[in-house]
Amino acid sequence: MHIDEIIEKIVPTDKDCQQKAQDRFDALIKPLGSLAQLETMTSRYAAILGKYKKEDIDYPKRSLFVWCDAAHGEQAAKIMRGQWPVVLLAAETNAKVEAFLVTAMDEEEALEEGAGLMQEHIHKDGLGLVGFGCVAAAEDELVISAMAGAILQAAAMKVPVMLDGVATCLAAKKAVALAPAVIDYCFAGHVSLEEGAEELLQELGLTAPLRLNIPDGAGEGVAVAFTLFNAGIKSFKEMETFEEAGVHVEMKEFSLHEQVKKEKAK
């Protein structure tokens, strides 16, 4: 499929579902906003799914894609043999790690190569969440274009992508330039120590839940952030609201959630 056809399929996420999911978090028996970015991640995920009821939000099957250039073929081979730290970290959330060696010779070919790989693996593996890492020469344009194509395809198929490091953020920036609604499908895994990492996330309007002082964007941060993605969903599904717990109305009136609602109504 040509990249323009993919772009035509990308639509903004359902902000009404996002707000209703956040409303559920606000109604849980806990301090308002106390789960911070866990709430934001899950509410944004609900918007992607177009669902907001707890029984409809499930843990997505996931993979972590590590993108490589020809100069890093040895690292790609080690990843596929399970001899790289990211493989062990990803296993904690049952995430499979795939290494992709970008072979495209120009930008258009790279965009379509990335899009094709993403489509193939979403269909083959039933993926609902994909993390990105990158092992390539700094700012390799063809690798960045391949990742951008993959992000576009994921957004067209309503699958969120979690970013790791400068190269993946540059890919997201490129994808957003082609289709602004793509940003709705992008999540930040962590802030790496790479130069410009924090500024790129700010430019994209994304906030990362982790700052692990990891010096690169090879995927380790995303592998750890996958556990937080699960934690947000678990809280959303398993914690109870005042109503679900059968808390008396007179007690509910003193909850922080209700007090904030009263303040907003003034």
Show the residue positions of the predicted features.
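N-terminal loops that bind phosphate or other acidic moieties
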Residues: 1-266
